[in-house]
Each structure stands twice: as C-alpha cells, then as structure tokens.
Amino acid sequence: MINKIFALPVVEQLTPVLSRRQIDGADVIVVDHPRVKASVALNGAHLLSWKPEGEVEGLWLSDATSFKKGAAIRGGVPICWPWFGPSAQPGLPSHGFARNQQWTLKAHNEDDSGAVLTFELQANDETRALWPHDFTLYARFKLGKTCEIELEAHGEFETTSALHTYFNVGDISAVKVSGLGDTFIDKVDNAKEGKLSDGVQAFPDRTDRKSVV
C-alpha cells in the first residue's frame, strides 16, 4: 500500500519536495525529500509512512485499509483524541473523532534535513454533536532522520489522547523499549500491576501493558 501511495499521480505540487495526491478520492500529502519519504492523509492528519534515507520503512500500513471519508485508517499513526479507548458515554466512537475528521494543511517548512508539516482541526457541527466543546487542534510532524509528532490543543476542556502507532517490526524478540517508567498494568494478566526490573520493556510473548507514569 505504501508503494502505491508514492506511485499516485500528483494533483498539486506544493513545493519541490511536497505534493498533494489522491487515493480513493482522499487527499494525501506526500513528502519526497532526499533525506526522508513520508505521507500524511488529510483524513485524520494520519501519518501513513515514514522512511528516512538509507533505512527501511518505519511504519506498517494494511494493504486492505480504506481511505474513504470518515473511515478509520488501519496502520500508520492514528490520532486518538479527545479520548483514548472506549468513550465513557455509550454510542460514541472509540478513540474519539479526530482520526475520522478532515484536517487542513496549515503550514509547512522544508530544509536540508527534512520537512515540518502542521495540520489543523477546528470544532464543527459534527464534532459538537459528539463532544460539546469548541477547540482548535494542531498536529505537527517533524520528518527527517527522526520522526517527532506534537499535538497542541486550544480550548477549555479535559481530554485524553494517544498516538496509536503501528510500527513496522521485523523480529519482535529483538525489540526493546525504554523511557516508559517501571510500573505497568498488565492487561493480559487481569490488569495486575507489575514492575520492570531494569526499566526496559521486551516482548518475549503476547504483551498488552499500560505504563503508569
């Protein structure tokens, strides 16, 4: 699927390294930079791919995913906002609505190291029907040798959020994650609390843990 995105015809050339393309009628911003190749769907401000120069693709994207308006894209980095997981109110979508809304490309900047893209989502009639708050939400992607994502919300409310990343992993037994703290809730083991002995999370078996920080 990622190769298909980069083979799409250019609808609008925004800069020498930035273009707008379409898949199934949905707009995708494609970064084709000497230092990095990446793509972001305007539906959900959803990072679909990120490949630094000389490296393998960092993200996984399902070949069967839908890009139709309002559909949740399977893979990449979904933005879960203004809540993560099931809603406390029955009938509302899991993981909020930001990932199913149409965002706008608000700003972009490119230099020798890569590109920075900023997308914006504002409250509208559809979001207010689900969540009665006015807001402006920005998603900022710094794409180069590394990938950094920032969410910036403006308004008066309380939220939870997540960047629900699908990594492209070769050998899961070789993967280790640090910096999450020592304490976790083990959802595989009836939500029992546990502690990492060295602060490093490995994946020898099925793992579904929530870090407590």
Language model regions located:
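Hydrophobic small-molecule pocket/channel-lining residues, especially in calycin-type beta-barrels
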Residues: G54-E57, L61, T127-D134, E156, ...
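Short, well-ordered beta-strand segments enriched in hydrophobic/aromatic residues
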Residues: A38-V40, F141, C147-G155
